[in-house]
């Protein structure tokens, strides 16, 4: 299954449950109750792979993909939108790439299985609610110094 949306193409491999996003620039934003192009296969998505060239993950892009366990993000990514991975209840750990600058409010809200997050030195702004209601989150690794954090 393949589809193109503005500057972004997506494809889904049913055997692996992998949704691959390719393109350049910013991903579209969606409203909280607006259907994304992959809405019909949302419950089958086990892995999201965003390729080099993409600079953002749009608002609500992968919201409520409850089978999503793995996310691969490129070093070209600089922005994670509001609710971008909200309600991804099977997601266990996230390594944010060097290059990301902004993580918006509730980007990982209610990711109840999320245990570990790695934050890069490039991070400039993280909303205090980015990981709200992630009760299992017990490990946050920052790859910079204390002075860089402040």
Predicted regions and their residues:
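The feature captures the LRR N-terminal capping module
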Residues: 1-19
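Extended Gly/Ser/Thr-rich low-complexity repeat segments
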Residues: 27-44
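Consensus positions within tandem repeat domains that build extended binding/scaffold surfaces
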Residues: 38, 58-61, 81-86, 104-109, ...
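Structural signature of tandem-repeat unit edges
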Residues: 16-25, 42-56, 66-79, 89-102, ...
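Short active-site-adjacent helix-start/loop capping segments
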Residues: 29-30, 56-59
């Amino acid at each position: 299954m393949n589809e193109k949306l503005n500057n972004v193409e997506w494809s889904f491999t049913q055997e692996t449950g992998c949704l691959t996003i390719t393109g350049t620039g910013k991903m579209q934003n969606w409203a909280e109750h607006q259907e994304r192009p992959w809405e019909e296969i949302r419950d089958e998505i086990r892995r999201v792979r965003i390729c080099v060239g993409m600079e953002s993950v749009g608002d609500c892009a992968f919201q409520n993909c409850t089978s999503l366990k793995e996310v691969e993000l490129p070093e070209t990514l600089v922005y994670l939108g509001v609710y971008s991975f909200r309600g991804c209840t099977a997601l266990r750990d996230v390594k944010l790439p060097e290059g990301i600058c902004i993580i918006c409010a509730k980007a990982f809200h209610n990711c109840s299985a999320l245990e570990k997050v790695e934050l890069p030195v490039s991070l400039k702004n993280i909303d205090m609610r980015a990981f709200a209601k992630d009760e299992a989150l017990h490990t946050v690794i920052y790859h910079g110094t204390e002075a860089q954090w402040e």
